[in-house]
Amino acid sequence: MTNTRKTHPLIKIINHSFIDLPAPSNISAWWNFGSLLGLCLTIQILTGLFLAMHYTSDTMTAFSSVTHICRDVNYGWLIRYMHANGASMFFICLFLHVGRGLYYGSYTYFETWNIGVILLFATMATAFMGYVLPWGQMSFWGATVITNLLSAIPYIGTTLVEWIWGGFSVDKATLTRFFAFHFILPFIIAALVXVHLLFLHETGSNNPSGLVSDSDKIPFHPYYTIKDALGILLLIMALMTLVLFSPDLLGDPDNYTPANPLSTPPHIKPEWYFLFAYAILRSIPNKLGGVLALVFSILILTLFPLLHLSKQRSMMFRPLSQCIFWILVADLFTLTWIGGQPVEYPFIIIGQLASILYFSIILLILPTASLIENKLLKW
């Protein structure tokens, strides 16, 4: 008798994706972040669903409804903080997942990589709109500042901003539409994840050596299901430690003050996971230039397959590229730090230098290092 999981039209798909999937035998813990991102998305959708049952997207009651969730709803505080800190965990996993892709040359899977970049953009948009919903000071002013960036677009900018706002300032219409988009986008992300996996399973996973591993494959279950289970356990432990011991660690105290259009906070800054891009935006004195740099700082990821000049796929055996890669990581930490600092000396110049270094490494230094390494191979 044939096995149901191999013949049933629906179960067969799951079987080919998570059970009998041939996987390289040498993939390290860096390959755990895909499943962890799936877990984060699931947590965010579930906690978000329960929050949406009690939240009201009206400027008069939004802040009070969040307070009501935390004070009066059974375990509302837990759901709210799991959702807020779950977003931080989501971005930690995202950055590590992208970093792994850059280090081991996974971007050579062109379609998978580009859908991944679209997923990153969609997640950033979702997180931004979610930050506006509690309608605290930083929510309101963050929404005002970031949406206002679109006014830098020539000719249609101002009209576009007012169209997004639904009026002449960030108000009730803006909050309502942000809530609607914040609710629907995670489901669009989930659909894109399936397409991301579809393209990945066309080629199979990359591995640390960057070599073709067709001759040495093992079944996904039980080897990688148990490995993913360990990663999931560690992620949940980290998330719950953050939620139960220091839930406001990564938040902004200003967001505990209800939104007031007449009082601007001294330092407007986004959540920590956007600070690197915010620093790049602020480092350019021109508004349109800053917006273009901001968009390009993420969009530049799509250029990696074109800028890959090395004869080897992975950085595993390329010490020069490894060194430059870690300088890039340090530069991103520097940008994140600068994004949270006030706009004054010496932070302005540090931010500008870090921004120049960021684009230089990706567009110039890494490809040059690859060519040098190619030459060294011939010696």
UniProtKB/Swiss-Prot annotation:
Gene Ontology BP, a term: mitochondrial electron transport, ubiquinol to cytochrome c
Annotated PROSITE patterns: CYTB_CTER, CYTB_NTER
Topology of this chain in the membrane: Multi-pass membrane protein
Cofactor binding, per record: Binds 2 heme b groups non-covalently.
Gene3D superfamilies: Cytochrome Bc1 Complex, Chain C (1.20.810.10)
Primary subcellular site in the record, as a coarse category: mitochondrion
Entry keyword set: Electron transport, Heme, Iron, Membrane, Metal-binding, Mitochondrion, Mitochondrion inner membrane, Respiratory chain, Transmembrane, Transmembrane helix, Transport, Ubiquinone
GO molecular function: metal ion binding; ubiquinol-cytochrome-c reductase activity
Pfam families (alphabetical): Cytochrom_B_C (PF00032), Cytochrome_B (PF00033)
UniProt: heme b b566 binding residues: 97, 196
GO CC, any one term: mitochondrial inner membrane
Cofactor: heme b
Binding-site list for heme b b562: 83, 182
Subcellular location: Mitochondrion inner membrane
Binding residue positions for a ubiquinone: 201
TM segment ranges: 33-53, 77-98, 113-133, 178-198, 226-246, 288-308, 320-340, 347-367
PANTHER family: CYTOCHROME B (PTHR19271:SF16)
Note: Heme 1 (or BL or b562) is low-potential and absorbs at about 562 nm, and heme 2 (or BH or b566) is high-potential and absorbs at about 566 nm.
Role according to the record: Component of the ubiquinol-cytochrome c reductase complex (complex III or cytochrome b-c1 complex) that is part of the mitochondrial respiratory chain. The b-c1 complex mediates electron transfer from ubiquinol to cytochrome c. Contributes to the generation of a proton gradient across the mitochondrial membrane that is then used for ATP synthesis.
Family classification: Belongs to the cytochrome b family.
Quaternary structure annotation from Swiss-Prot or TrEMBL: The cytochrome bc1 complex contains 11 subunits: 3 respiratory subunits (MT-CYB, CYC1 and UQCRFS1), 2 core proteins (UQCRC1 and UQCRC2) and 6 low-molecular weight proteins (UQCRH/QCR6, UQCRB/QCR7, UQCRQ/QCR8, UQCR10/QCR9, UQCR11/QCR10 and a cleavage product of UQCRFS1). This cytochrome bc1 complex then forms a dimer.
Name of protein: Cytochrome b
Organism field: Xerospermophilus mohavensis (Mohave ground squirrel)
Gene name of the record: MT-CYB
